[in-house]
């Protein structure tokens, strides 16, 4: 069983990418569980056809500790098992704690004991704070992929996440599997992302082009592969899934200084 965490800045398309990627893996016959690690609890809605899933934290609050796996785990497209960790009520407590509680709960209920090929953790945002670092800090996820684009703030966030991976890699055994570009159609984006990944000592594992069908599928509460399986974008997600399934390059990243990051962007005509 491979345990993979997907990180990236807020709004980069991390949850969309994760769900379309897992739909492609599921279609190919892989057994998958997605654990949504975002208080918004939107990591599984395309797999579940728009079903707003009750989160682990809400279930615990309403029903106490005596819960069954079926209460928090729902099957969706291609039999993909879906869990949303959720978080505390707004303004109260640390959302990262929800991730810790959820993973511990899933372990105690035997969720990891089935014949899974993959567990994906879709993790909130720009910071790798204590709670959100849980999947890598505790060595739950052995592989990390960072979703980025050719925009400055996306690369700042990716570089910060690389710092977090570097910090925990030595103790937890986690490695960076690569950068996934979710294209924003920025000039020289492909070249910039390849250079950025190389600078980290990693690879651009896949460049996902921008296509409006992704939004159309989202409005219809489906992954692209379910919504329009024969379209070009569905094949892009299949190719991304194949790249990750066959990946053999796992590194401790070498994050760069901010000055070097800005220099890299100037070299590729993004700044200046």
UniProtKB/Swiss-Prot annotation:
GO terms for molecular function: 4 iron, 4 sulfur cluster binding; ATP binding; metal ion binding; nitrogenase activity. It catalyses: N2 + 8 reduced [2Fe-2S]-[ferredoxin] + 16 ATP + 16 H2O = H2 + 8 oxidized [2Fe-2S]-[ferredoxin] + 2 NH4(+) + 16 ADP + 16 phosphate + 6 H(+). Its EC number is 1.18.6.1. Keywords: 4Fe-4S, ADP-ribosylation, ATP-binding, Iron, Iron-sulfur, Metal-binding, Nitrogen fixation, Nucleotide-binding, Oxidoreductase. It is an enzyme of class 1 (oxidoreductase). Pfam families: Fer4_NifH (PF00142). The keyword Iron-sulfur applies. One of its GO terms (biological process) is nitrogen fixation. [4Fe-4S] cluster binds at residues 94, 129. The modification ADP-ribosylarginine is found at residue 97. The reversible ADP-ribosylation of Arg-97 inactivates the nitrogenase reductase and regulates nitrogenase activity. InterPro entries: NifH/chlL_CS (IPR030655), NifH/frxC (IPR000392), Nitrogenase_Fe_NifH (IPR005977), P-loop_NTPase (IPR027417). Its cofactor is [4Fe-4S] cluster. It comes from the Bacteria. Homodimer. Belongs to the NifH/BchL/ChlL family. The key enzymatic reactions in nitrogen fixation are catalyzed by the nitrogenase complex, which has 2 components: the iron protein and the molybdenum-iron protein. This is Nitrogenase iron protein. The lineage of its organism: Bacteria, Bacillati, Bacillota, Clostridia, Peptostreptococcales.
